[in-house]
Amino acid sequence: MKNKVLFALIIPLLSCSLIGCSKQDERVLLTYGTEIQQNLVTLKEVNNDELYDKAFNEKEVFLLAVYQGGYSEDCLCWSTYQDVIVNYMNSNHELVYVYDAQKQDDSLKDLKITKYEDSAPSLYIFKGQEQITSFTYKKSQDKAIFEDRKGEAMKERVHKYANKPLLYYVSPEFVLDNKSTHHKSIAVLYVRRGCGDCKYVLPNVVIPYINSNNNVNPIYIVDLQDLYDLQNKGETSGMPYDAIKNRLELTESSNKTFGYRGGVVPTIQYYEKGVLSDASVFFNDEVSQKEDGSYYISDSFYSEERLTSIKYAKYIDNNVLKGMDINKEDVITTATGYTYWSQEKAAKYHAPLFQSFIEYYCSFILPANNS
């Protein structure tokens, strides 16, 4: 795939020539960044459950800015550091979560986040539940991190331990502007943060692939949850959820080849110079029962009709799922009678296809040595 044999020969030779076969970069790879402009209102404060999920379940690599509850409310050092965080995120496009240490419960004790009985802010770098390092306003050598409003001191210290992420949150408008104006070649992953399939695909498929491959271009993520919630509440301000799915060509009615049904998540698209040229849909298969009681996939993005158009699928043996028989024990039926393919079993077929898409469109080719 894309001359992988040649890549395998080039990579070690090139890396040795560029860095003299020095010690491998041991910095961690931050998981998420953002291209969405931030301000004090948009800073993401996580609660105990959210922090536990990021550290223990999703094994995310992240930056955590910590304040001390009521001790910090009227403190200039914390209000200054909030400005630092905003400027840092807007300049470096790296997500920073905010957390109140005074609300910490026993479930998070292994993170070793310090509670102070004063206003001193802190900054932590976590790789899952492992604390990579921490900085505190209490240490004179760390104070610049919390006082340099431009975020340059924070950048210098953070990047000694962490590399920039490869997954960046963007707005739907970012994608639409690229289609109409900028015409860049980009990969875009559509999710909803409340979607179970999306919670599965990122930590179990996308992130492990990125962490094990150092030749991946950035992937942009659009979280459609807010638009989905507004539509369900009957609020019509702005562009409705269904309308944005059509404009993004997620629906089959807007793009017969690369759209699927009414538009589903998780879906990843590839835009070649602003034009949608391929896509991959994770899960979202329809399961039906035959007259003899057996089950099969009655609808899937991976059909015979699409096979000639989805270029990455030819590298995967099981690339047509529509019409495939599945075992009865692999089917889950809800209390309302809805049937679906279990995540564990479906992932054996969907994960290779999704990762093949990433490898085909997001891996970059090392430049040839023409000297």
PLM features: what roles do these ranges have?
Residues 1-5:
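Positively charged n-region of N-terminal signal peptides that target proteins for export
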Residues 16-20:
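C-terminal motif of bacterial Sec signal peptides marking the signal peptidase cleavage site
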Residues 22-24:
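Bacterial signal peptide processing site
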Residues 38, 47-94, 174-222:
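Local sequence-structure signature of Cys/Sec-based thiol-disulfide redox active-site neighborhoods
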Residues 45, 67, 93-108, 190, ...:
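Thiol-based oxidoreductase modules, predominantly thioredoxin-like and allied folds used
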Residues 121-122, 192-200, 264-269:
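C-type cytochrome heme c attachment motif
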Residues 124-163, 258-370:
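Non-catalytic, surface beta->alpha helical segment in thiol-disulfide oxidoreductase systems
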Residues 239-261, 271-273:
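Short, internal strand/loop/helix patches
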